């Protein structure tokens, strides 16, 4: 109780979509209860500034492009649902408990220490092992990839702005570039100097 930070940055959560079908209890415990517990502690200690991680998963299969913060929320899985609920919880705690926050909807974060179940890491591994990479729709699906260093820089900038901010605001954190997955695979081939084996 003697430690009174001016800002809490919460990036903790159980990530991933597929695992949410296997262990939904973990997503409810960490993503919902964990977030609620954090806000309760902040309320008790009179801490009023929060930056927290949300996700582009709140949009599901977006029907508007480019997707902006006012786009319809259509989560397709429990992971996305927990992020939508977190945003609602943050809004309630701002209104009734004076906790002002920025929610950051990250779009496919990547980096050198990225999760092994993510597209880039999985593709690199399969190219090296000469395993088949399944590409649907001839690899024409697109994603927006955001490097972790860009994410850190954005969080740093927002950490300076939140000091004088009152309210609850959501931000899409992305590169604003739609990358086709077949283009991604070709780029990885060039970097690795190896050919991939793809299947449509």
Predicted regions and their residues:
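A glycine/serine/threonine-rich, flexible loop-to-helix segment
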Residues: 65, 116-126, 188
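C-terminal substrate-binding subdomain of Rossmann-fold SDR/epimerase-dehydratase oxidoreductases
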Residues: 127-200
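N-terminal Rossmann-like NAD(P)+-binding domain of SDR-like oxidoreductases, especially those catalyzing
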Residues: 1-109, 190
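A short, amphipathic alpha-helix embedded in the catalytic core of nucleotide-handling enzymes
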Residues: 38, 93, 122-127, 154-158
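Short glycine-/acidic-enriched loop or helix-start segments at secondary-structure transitions
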Residues: 19-20, 61-63, 113, 145, ...
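Residue-level signal for the nucleotide or nucleotide-sugar donor/cofactor binding architecture
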Residues: 22, 30-33, 70, 77, ...
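Residues in well-ordered alpha-helical elements
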Residues: 6, 18, 25, 36, ...
């Amino acid at each position: 109780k003697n430690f009174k930070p001016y800002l809490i940055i919460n990036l903790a959560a159980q990530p991933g979509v597929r695992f949410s079908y296997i262990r939904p209890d973990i997503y409810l415990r960490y993503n919902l209860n964990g977030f609620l517990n954090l806000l309760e502690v902040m309320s008790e200690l009179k801490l009023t500034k929060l930056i927290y991680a949300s996700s582009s998963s709140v949009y599901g299969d977006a029907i508007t492009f480019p997707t902006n913060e006012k786009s319809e929320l259509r989560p397709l899985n429990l992971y996305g649902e927990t992020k939508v609920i977190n945003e609602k919880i943050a809004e309630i705690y701002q209104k009734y408990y004076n906790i002002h926050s920025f929610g950051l909807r990250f779009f496919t974060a990547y980096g050198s220490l990225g999760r092994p179940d993510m597209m880039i890491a999985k593709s690199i591994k399969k190219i090296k092992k000469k395993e088949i990479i399944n590409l649907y729709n001839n690899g024409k699906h697109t994603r927006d990839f955001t490097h972790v260093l860009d994410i850190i820089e954005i969080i740093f900038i927002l950490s300076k702005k939140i000091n004088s901010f009152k309210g609850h605001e959501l931000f899409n954190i992305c590169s604003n570039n739609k990358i086709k997955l077949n283009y991604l695979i070709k780029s990885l081939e060039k970097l690795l100097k190896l050919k991939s084996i793809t299947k449509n």
